[in-house]
A protein has these predicted regions:
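N-terminal helix-turn-helix/winged-helix DNA-binding helices
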Residues: 2-6, 45-78, 82, 93, ...
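Short coil turns linking two alpha-helices in DNA-binding domains
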Residues: 17-22, 34
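Short beta-strand segments enriched in small/hydrophobic residues
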Residues: 20-23, 59-74, 184-192
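Short beta-strand elements in bilobed, periplasmic/extracellular small-molecule ligand-binding domains
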Residues: 91-101, 207-239
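Flexible loop/hinge segments that line or gate small-molecule binding clefts
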Residues: 127-172, 188-192, 265, 291-303
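Hydrophobic alpha-helical segments within soluble ligand-binding/sensing domains
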Residues: 160-188, 204, 208, 239-248, ...
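An alpha-beta-alpha
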Residues: 173-216, 334-352
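Flexible loop/turn connectors
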Residues: 243, 247-354
């Protein structure tokens, strides 16, 4: 019978102490080691065929019915709406929620992810794609804890997803503007970086429709600089993007007939900048957002926005986790995942433009 590999064996092979091996293998999030040390220990464990022991629970005790939800911020009502959908369904099933607000801070996201090994929730939901540099880590966690992602997931990740077709949303927005005769338009967006591919997909979908109409050169794209995603001190950053970039746009041109915000929060900033410039909405310039958030429904808002049933997507993500818990397997086991979940809700407009 093959001898069971212990942390002491790994320590000898890696040339480090047994306590170092224990902390690295147990993913102690409050202790940091040199990257070389971590790699040495992980490689030694892999080569020796180390199998981590199953966690022991006290007799008669039950694992807490807990789900963890990762959010990039809680100032955009879109994420609050997703949370409401998740929490409503979780509550029906007797689960509690632990919300990790990463504020788009890579260090915070990494810290929360490493906490998962100790917290051991019954499921994890990402309300947007994990940051690119942590996709492998999320995949590793998904081997032991059910994970679901809301948004266009990375094709390299074998993790269940509720698909949000950002490209389609962009196309729908563009078609509506074209049908209304808007030829010269502007699109205001947050940073369009590799880290936030879903944003780029929405913009690309919009541009494709204008290109098909032979009007690609009539679309002005104004995207914020990447630094704004790091400026977590300002909780109203998306509103500021809309406001500041619209002021910049008005200094450059005055002949656009419509301005699109990537989401409602940006569109609110657009509207305030236009109001300050004494430009009437929608009489002079039409404004469009996306997500149909609470503020967009207020009586004095002349904002056209797209309803794509955000709360339902939250429920769907929670439903994936419940099904996976019930079937006692996670995404990367031999049994197929519940699905790469795709529920298509046909987007429709609210407060139509003129």
């Amino acid at each position: 019978m093959k001898k069971k590999v212990t942390s002491t064996d790994i320590a000898h092979a890696a040339g480090v102490s047994q306590s170092t091996v224990s902390m690295i293998l147990n993913k102690k999030y409050d202790v940091s080691f040199a990257k070389e040390t971590v790699e040495k220990v992980e490689n030694a464990a892999k080569e020796l065929g180390y199998v981590p022991p199953k966690r022991k629970t006290r007799k008669g005790t039950k694992r807490e019915k807990l789900l963890v939800v990762f959010c990039p911020n809680l100032t955009n009502p879109y994420y609050v709406m997703l949370l409401q959908g998740i929490e409503a369904h979780a509550k029906e099933k007797g689960f509690g929620l632990f919300v990790c607000n990463t504020q788009r801070d890579l260090r915070m996201e990494e810290r929360y992810l490493k906490m998962m090994w100790q917290l051991r929730p019954l499921g994890i939901i990402y309300t947007c794609n994990p940051s690119h540099c942590f996709m492998d880590l999320v995949g590793e966690i998904a081997e032991q804890i059910p994970v679901a992602i809301v948004n266009n997931q990375n094709e390299k990740m074998n993790v269940d997803a509720v698909e949000l077709d950002n490209s389609k949303l962009g196309r729908v927005m563009a078609k509506h503007l074209l049908e209304l005769g808007h030829r010269k338009v502007a699109y205001i967006a947050p940073p369009l970086t590799a880290r936030q591919k879903q944003r780029s997909k929405r913009v690309e979908g919009f541009l494709k429709e204008y290109e098909k109409a032979g009007l690609r050169d009539q679309v002005i794209i104004k995207a914020a600089k990447e630094e704004i995603d790091l400026d977590v001190a300002h909780i109203d950053s998306e509103y500021k993007i809309g406001y500041e970039l619209t002021k910049e746009l008005l200094n450059e041109t005055t002949d656009v007939t419509a301005i699109v915000g990537l989401n409602d929060m940006i569109a609110f900033g657009v509207m305030d900048a236009l109001y300050e410039a004494k430009i009437k909405v929608p009489a002079d310039v039409s404004v469009m957002g996306c997500d149909n958030t609470l503020f967009a429904r207020m009586h004095n808002m002349n904002l056209t926005t797209i309803e794509h049933f955000v709360t339902f997507k939250g429920r769907d993500a929670c439903d994936i986790i419940m099904k996976k818990i019930a079937s006692h397997h996670s995404a990367n086991m031999e049994t197929a995942p519940i699905s790469t979940y795709h529920v298509e809700y046909e987007p429709h407009f609210r407060n139509l433009l003129r």
